[in-house]
Amino acid sequence: MTWNPLALATALQTVPEQNIDVTNSENALIIKMNDYGDLQINILFTSRQMIIETFICPVSSISNPDEFNTFLLRNQKMMPLSSVGISSVQQEEYYIVFGALSLKSSLEDILLEITSLVDNALDLAEITEEYSH
């Protein structure tokens, strides 16, 4: 099966252990993780893959971005299945955690990616407190 936003939204809502709200559009899903402080996960669909991401904090909230970036690069391996990046939203830059999957991934693999991303995002959000002003 090749996933699209509607098919994945339908499948995710049938998984009983997932307490989520899903909003879908033509090329994306927005998932609210109700058991994780309403953390928002975005799933963007391209012609070959889906990119799963969440925002951590504005870059401007970090007191020493160079030091924080060095920490992230040195410790990236501690976040399985996820990467950290910077993305611009309405002219402000944010740290994000993201992962990518094939459109042909199993629902089990997608759920693993989402779960890992949420865990990694929460861990990183906690770490940012040490670097915030």
From Swiss-Prot:
Superkingdom of source: Bacteria
Pfam families: DUF2170
Family annotation (InterPro entries): DUF2170
Protein name: Uncharacterized protein YjfI
